């Protein structure tokens, strides 16, 4: 997964830089969100793996599916999924047509297809969202601990992360008893493992090296 995130990083940055400079972050994020769902579909995966289908045809197919889903005035599965993630959405919007993919988005998709990187779109989407959060000076930190965090621990972790990242940090908590003690912190594709389990793994690696 880390390797895929690394491969996706330059594409996500290029997409976000363009979207940010041209004030179209929402349009690009909507496209990448739906495209991630399409690319994850088993039938689409088979199409991507078919050598008889050209890169141009694959790109056109993805854009066509997106346009069909969002420009319809009827409720469609992917449009409903998109609207359900937007807090400002009301029921009437599900029957409204949304904008089709722009020429710039189409060009981006064709570049991905030519470089055989369409399968990276889910990772591009996640990286794009990370860039957006950073641009807004807001970072999501996923903290997994062996036991539920106390309020004091939560505040301490958040304060240290905000001082380090120079940004507002939103803590997402999870509990994993197998960590034994301590915690892991994941931000984007970066993971800091300060758990006892992680330290034991490091020790084992050193002893067997």
Curated annotation (Swiss-Prot):
Pfam families: OSCP (PF00213). GO terms for cellular component: plasma membrane; proton-transporting ATP synthase complex. Its main location: membrane. Coiled coil: none annotated. One of its GO terms (molecular function) is proton-transporting ATP synthase activity, rotational mechanism. It is found in: Cell inner membrane. It is a peripheral membrane protein. Keywords: ATP synthesis, Cell inner membrane, Cell membrane, CF(1), Hydrogen ion transport, Ion transport, Membrane, Transport. InterPro entries: ATP_synth_OSCP/delta_N_sf (IPR026015), ATPase_OSCP/d_CS (IPR020781), ATPase_OSCP/dsu (IPR000711). F(1)F(0) ATP synthase produces ATP from ADP in the presence of a proton or sodium gradient. F-type ATPases consist of two structural domains, F(1) containing the extramembraneous catalytic core and F(0) containing the membrane proton channel, linked together by a central stalk and a peripheral stalk. During catalysis, ATP synthesis in the catalytic domain of F(1) is coupled via a rotary mechanism of the central stalk subunits to proton translocation. This protein is part of the stalk that links CF(0) to CF(1). It either transmits conformational changes from CF(0) to CF(1) or is implicated in proton conduction. Belongs to the ATPase delta chain family. F-type ATPases have 2 components, F(1) - the catalytic core - and F(0) - the membrane proton channel. F(1) has five subunits: alpha(3), beta(3), gamma(1), delta(1), epsilon(1). F(0) has three main subunits: a(1), b(2) and c(10-14). The alpha and beta chains form an alternating ring which encloses part of the gamma chain. F(1) is attached to F(0) by a central stalk formed by the gamma and epsilon chains, while a peripheral stalk is formed by the delta and b chains. PANTHER family: ATP SYNTHASE DELTA CHAIN. This is ATP synthase subunit delta. It comes from Psychrobacter sp. (strain PRwf-1). The gene is atpH.
């Amino acid at each position: 997964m880390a390797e895929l995130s690394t491969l996706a990083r330059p594409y996500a940055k290029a997409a976000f830089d363009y979207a940010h400079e041209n004030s179209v972050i929402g349009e690009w994020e909507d496209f990448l969100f739906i495209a991630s769902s399409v690319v994850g579909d088993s039938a689409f995966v088979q199409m991507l793996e078919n050598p008889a289908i050209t890169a141009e045809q694959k790109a056109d197919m993805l854009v066509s599916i997106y346009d069909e889903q969002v420009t319809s005035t009827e409720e469609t599965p992917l449009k409903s999924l998109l609207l359900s993630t937007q807090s400002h959405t009301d029921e009437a919007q599900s029957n409204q047509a949304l904008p089709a993919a722009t020429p710039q988005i189409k060009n981006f998709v064709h570049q991905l297809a030519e470089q055989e990187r369409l399968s990276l779109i889910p990772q591009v989407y996640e990286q794009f969202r990370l860039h957006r959060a950073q641009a807004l000076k807001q970072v999501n930190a996923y903290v997994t601990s062996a036991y539920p965090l106390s309020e004091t621990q939560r505040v301490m972790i958040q304060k240290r992360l905000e001082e380090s990242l120079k940004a507002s940090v939103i803590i997402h908590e999870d509990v994993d008893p197998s960590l034994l003690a301590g915690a892991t912190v994941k931000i984007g594709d970066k993971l800091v493992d300060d758990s006892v389990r992680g330290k034991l793994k490091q020790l084992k690696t050193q002893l067997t090296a």
